Curated annotation (Swiss-Prot):
Its EC number is 6.3.4.4. HAMAP family: Adenylosucc_synth (MF_00011). This is Adenylosuccinate synthetase. It comes from Lysinibacillus sphaericus (strain C3-41). The gene is purA. It comes from the Bacteria. Pathway: Purine metabolism; AMP biosynthesis via de novo pathway; AMP from IMP: step 1/2. Its cofactor is Mg(2+). Binds 1 Mg(2+) ion per subunit. GTP binds at residues 12-18, 40-42, 304, 330-332, 412-414. InterPro entries: Adenylosuccin_syn_GTP-bd, Adenylosuccin_syn_Lys_AS, Adenylosuccinate_synth_dom1, Adenylosuccinate_synth_dom2, Adenylosuccinate_synth_dom3, Adenylosuccinate_synthetase, P-loop_NTPase. Gene3D superfamilies: Adenylosuccinate Synthetase, subunit A, domain 1, Adenylosuccinate Synthetase, subunit A, domain 2, Adenylosuccinate Synthetase, subunit A, domain 3.
Amino acid sequence: MTSVVVVGTQWGDEGKGKITDFLSQKADAIARFAGGDNAGHTIKIDGETYKLHLIPSGIFYKEKTSVIGNGLVVNPKSLVTELKGLQERGINTDNLRISNRAHVILPYHIKQDIADEESRGDNKIGTTCKGIGPCYQDKVARIGIRMADLLDKDIFEEKLRHNLAIKNKLFEKFYEVEGLTFEEIFEEYYGYGQEIAKYVTDTSKILNDVLDEGGKVLFEGAQGILLDVDQGTYPYVTSSNPVAGGVAIGAGVGPSRVTSVIGVSKAYTSRVGDGPFPTELFDEVGQQIREVGREYGTTTGRPRRVGWFDTVVVRHSRRVSGITHLALNSIDVLSGLETVKICTAYNYKGETITEYPANLHIIEQCEPIYEELPGWSEDVTACRTLEELPENARRYVERVSELTGIQIATFSVGPAREQTNVLVDVWEA
């Protein structure tokens, strides 16, 4: 029995899909445990590019089980569209399983998300307006509709009528916008439910059975630890728990069954949306990193904010998520820079801070303290071992490991599967 959790150590978009795809080769099952279609994974296989939002990266291995766990919130319309897109490209999706306990995103969640963001004025939190937050709100308020409900026509009708009565009062009285009708939702979404019904089951049992039989399970994280609702830069966070601990809740697998946690980082930092970002770059170097790294959101298409690698952030992620290994991506993006910098601490009003503050007011006033290293001009995309990297690039990788206190398991020099280079096999570690 072995299980590996993949988490993002920054604000998402670190390349988790690439690492998950790579590690999936040795897994028997691959499961997502948090988030929804607000997170995007880009995967390159045999020269083909695939962009996933809900479906686990393991879908490309027909002999392996791919699981959408109970911790996700699922938009059936988006899921059906994504499934058809894969099927049209010749990908067999019969290995997908969806938790019957996963909550369902409905049109009123999206409408509420948009209305709520607009009502914030200048204090927007940068939501993707996919209905994620409102769906999690309903889950906690115990009025959510789960997959098991969606598949039962009578129960779905009853719950939908009840919820629409509540939501329409909210739309009309509070947001002062027009409500939604039962008719424009019911048949369409019940239809989506019937299209995906064959995939819906008790996924917790499936995953635990794999582990009981001595198999390997890979848990695919979404977003990043700094977007975690508890451990991230609140309120500029998502509504779920992307930390490794989210596996126990969102996949129905006990914490004692997790054997290792691999944190994924870029060789720099990026962020979409608002919120503090101490190492953010606004100069030509930042623009170069953005363009070379193609830093535009998979889900939103928005330009990502970019900055230097921040060890304060990654050490925080290591601590709250129990990270045992690091996957360092996008080293190739830094090629051509005369100098590269690593943030080692923050300066706050003359005080050196080495732990990530909870107070956003403090973070916004923090100045990064950098360690500067010489850059490299060589093309590293063909490097397959640490020794093949230019000396300065190799020193950069080693310094990241030293400053974060995390052993590096893989380093990547490009988006393709064969450009991921293994230093430690986490399945055997």
